[in-house]
Regions:
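An N-terminal, globular interaction/scaffold subdomain
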Residues: 1-89
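Hydrophobic alpha-helical transmembrane segments and adjacent interfacial helices
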Residues: 40-59, 78-86, 101-119, 175-191, ...
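Membrane-interface segments at the starts/ends of alpha-helical transmembrane spans
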Residues: 58-64, 123-138, 249-261
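Generic multipass alpha-helical transmembrane bundles of integral membrane proteins
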Residues: 91-218
């Protein structure tokens, strides 16, 4: 296969199982505050003390600085978003509303640094328990990630939905930016931890995109934080699932495949950046202060569905 080695039927079953588990886990933790508290506060404390020091140690494929930073930054996002959702004073505080784009930007920056780092290694071998192939694709995708970061916009328009779930709604974060993010992030995972990308790339990204498009529109970042935290906690506790279990699916490590996914990611993010520049210039808008896409039907429908 082009992107991956052979994918047996039981790995496809596991893939759909992971996808379903992440979507269900997200639904549980977003609907009930007690569930979010248990999963994103109590469970990580237990795992940090009793599990991860053994399962995600230096000899593990999840024992790198990136995985440790990623799990805690994802959890920080979950807790920060819960604070905004459940503490009324924060919902109108401009500094508090700057937290969601800040934590998102930090997560994107972490991945860009890692892509550039892998590119600079000049390797085609096992590194930190993961087979890596360095090449121009790392730099291409790092640039795509920076463009994705720079096109984050409209955060002062974040508000809390008026239903019982009290979701964090970001109307200006529309479908085209989300797709560009997904393409970039899949390329990142494929470039830097390719043998994890069947699950940590495809299944994980789809698990937050489906809710954002079909279950609770406008809450993509909340869905992303929840599913990422759930996946990172699991994979740091059971790294063998994606590396050596019967369900593991290895990447092809094909230069053409690496180049293709990064080129698509770069093209998508260039397109979003150019469109955003057009909107800013045409509407004379300030991307650091204004919501940019208020004229679009997609924006209006998200906002109207949650107020």
């Amino acid at each position: 296969m082009f992107l991956f080695e052979s994918i047996p039927w039981y790995s496809w079953l596991a893939w759909f199982g992971v996808l379903a588990a992440l979507i269900i886990g997200n639904e549980i933790t977003r609907r009930w505050k007690w569930a979010g508290t248990a999963i994103f506060i109590v469970l990580p404390i237990v795992l940090t003390i009793f599990v991860w020091p053994t399962t995600a140690g230096p000899d593990s494929s999840t024992g790198t600085w990136f995985h440790w930073v990623k799990v805690y930054s994802a959890l920080a996002g979950c807790l920060g978003f819960m604070a905004i959702r459940y503490i009324p004073k924060l919902q109108t505080n401009r500094w508090a509303l700057a937290f969601p784009p800040a934590i998102l930007a930090i997560n994107i920056t972490e991945a860009c640094i890692r892509d550039f780092q892998v590119g600079a290694m000049g390797v085609r071998e096992m590194v930190d328990g993961v087979f890596m192939v360095s090449g121009p694709w790392n730099y291409m995708n790092g640039i795509a990630g920076l463009l994705n970061l720079l096109t984050i916009c409209g955060w002062f328009g974040i508000f809390i939905s008026r239903d019982k779930e009290q979701d964090m709604i970001w109307p200006d974060m529309l479908w085209f930016w989300i797709i560009a993010y997904d393409l970039w992030n899949f390329a990142y995972v494929y470039n830097c931890v390719g043998d994890h990308s069947f699950y940590a790339g495809a299944a994980l990204l789809i698990s937050c995109t489906i809710p954002a498009f079909f279950i609770k529109r406008g809450a993509w970042l909340q869905h992303r934080a929840h599913t990422l935290a759930l996946w990172m906690m699991f994979t740091m506790a059971v790294p063998s699932f994606v590396t050596s279990s019967k369900f593991a699916v290895n990447a092809s490590h094909n230069d053409a495949a690496l180049m293709t996914v990064s080129a698509i990611a770069l093209a998508a993010n260039v397109a979003v950046a150019l469109y955003q520049i057009y909107v800013i210039v045409r509407g004379r808008k300030n991307p650091l202060r204004d919501e940019l896409y208020t004229d679009l039907e997609a924006y209006k429908s998200v906002r109207e569905a949650n107020i």
